[in-house]
Amino acid sequence: DTGWSHAYMDECFKREGIDTMLKNGEIEFLFVSHEHLDHFWGLQTVLKYNPEIKIIIPETFYPEGMHLIKGAEFITPGACNRIPHQGKLVQLKIGETNKLYEGCAAVAFDLPIVIRVRGEQSLFFNVKDKGLVCVTGCCHQSILTMADYGQQKIAGGETMYGVYGGLHIAPFGPLNERGEKIVKGMAKYNFKKVACNHCTGLPAVNRMIELGYPVVQGTGSNGSKSNLYVGNGDEVTFG
């Protein structure tokens, strides 16, 4: 994903060395989980350093999203990309398991999401001698839906090892009944590492900790809300 603000993402890229990696072709592709502004509108910053990078999106992208990739400006919402994409664009079909490379698969889930967005794609990694790791953008489909898919249809799914990314459980306030159900439902997968971040929400993280889940702590740096879970600039190793 690309973040939202061009200036902020440029700052982050330089801080973490992503700008150099993009320029040197060390990053094989850009995987955009869904069309929400905080995951997609920072596209120009990526293309600034490598306009030919391969981009992978779900097939549910709206025409406006496709136009943004090609180079467009939308005045009212404030989205723009002045660097047209020149590389390969791959659209993943909903509900299919797509092998990206050995040990890594992508799946696009079909669902309506707030602010006129449809569909979200996520990643599964089969880590040798560990098990399956679920990697998400926001996981609007819910981590339960994603983990069930991994268990049933992805090689290595008999052992669910870890989670990384946003889980969209309590992003804007207290943990509600649905959020409580999701958090409690995670227990059946027996994850060994829960590296949740972004839209998971601190109330959900606190509940996971209360239930004894192995939540990976962060550093609380670079504007992160808390060190109780992974934040900006933090790294997690699953191998």
Where are these regions (language model features)?
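Charged helix-capping and loop-helix junction motifs
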Residues: 175-185
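Active-site-proximal loop/helix segment associated with metal-binding centers of metalloenzymes
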Residues: 71-73, 77-130
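Active-site neighborhood of phospho(di)ester-bond hydrolases with catalytic His/Asp-centered motifs
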Residues: 1-2, 26-36, 56-59, 134-138, ...
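Active-site environment of divalent metal-dependent phosphoester hydrolases
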Residues: 6-7, 35-42, 62-65, 140-144, ...
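Binuclear metal-ion centers of metallo-dependent hydrolases, dominated by the metallo-beta-lactamase
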Residues: 185-239
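Pre-active-site segment of Zn-dependent metallo-hydrolases
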Residues: 1-29, 143-144, 150-153
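Active-site HxH/HxHxD metal-binding segment of metal-dependent hydrolases
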Residues: 25-92, 96, 187-193, 209, ...
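Conserved beta-strand hairpin/beta-sheet module of binuclear metal-dependent hydrolase folds
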Residues: 1-16, 120-136
